Regions:
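Beta-sheet repeat architectures centered on beta-propellers
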Residues: 1-167
Length: 167
């Protein structure tokens, strides 16, 4: 808690994947963890009760979410690969309007080469195939959104990849 408070009003988060720390201020006076409920009510000193981990938004504001793979080889040795289609496997849940996510394909020409954003495409609930263009020896895929009330679950990342010669 802060120096002027007798109750918890600060938080510290360490993100192991991104190797960074986050700090902030959020007063909490009680926490009820029933063990069988998926809703976690939390009391505050301002006489509000919050339900944590409910919905897809941040108290009425859009909450950004993303999933990003590590680099993976798309072709062995000296050969490049050409990625020409993305076949999305994504389920939108509890979303309002026309939900969508953005797929970004990042490529490298070599293991120590610069990571380049090669192709970006938007995928909605009715998208069956997205035609894209990306070329490299290694690829990384990022799926993200920052829309209000947009819940989604990612399945397999399916790409149409062809051998594309040397350079």
């Amino acid at each position: 808690c802060s120096e002027s408070s007798d109750e918890i009003d600060r938080y510290v988060i360490y993100n192991y994947m991104e190797n960074n720390w986050s700090i902030g201020q959020l007063s909490r006076t009680s926490w009820h963890d029933t063990g069988t409920s998926s809703v976690y009510p939390i009391g505050t000193s301002s006489n509000y009760i919050y339900n944590h981990e409910v919905g897809y938004d941040n108290d009425g504001s859009a909450m950004s979410a993303y999933v990003e793979s590590a680099d993976f080889d798309v072709e062995d040795g000296n050969n490049f690969a050409f990625i020409r289609r993305l076949i999305p496997d994504i389920l939108f849940t509890g979303s309002a309007g026309s939900p969508s996510v953005t797929y970004t394909l990042k490529t490298r020409s070599s293991g120590s080469g610069t990571l380049v954003s090669a192709s970006t495409t938007s995928v909605g609930s009715t998208t069956e195939i997205s035609h894209i263009r990306a070329r490299g020896r290694q690829i990384r895929v990022r799926i993200e959104n920052s829309d209000l009330a947009n819940g989604w679950r990612l399945g397999d990342v399916r790409l149409d990849i062809r051998q594309d010669g040397r350079r």
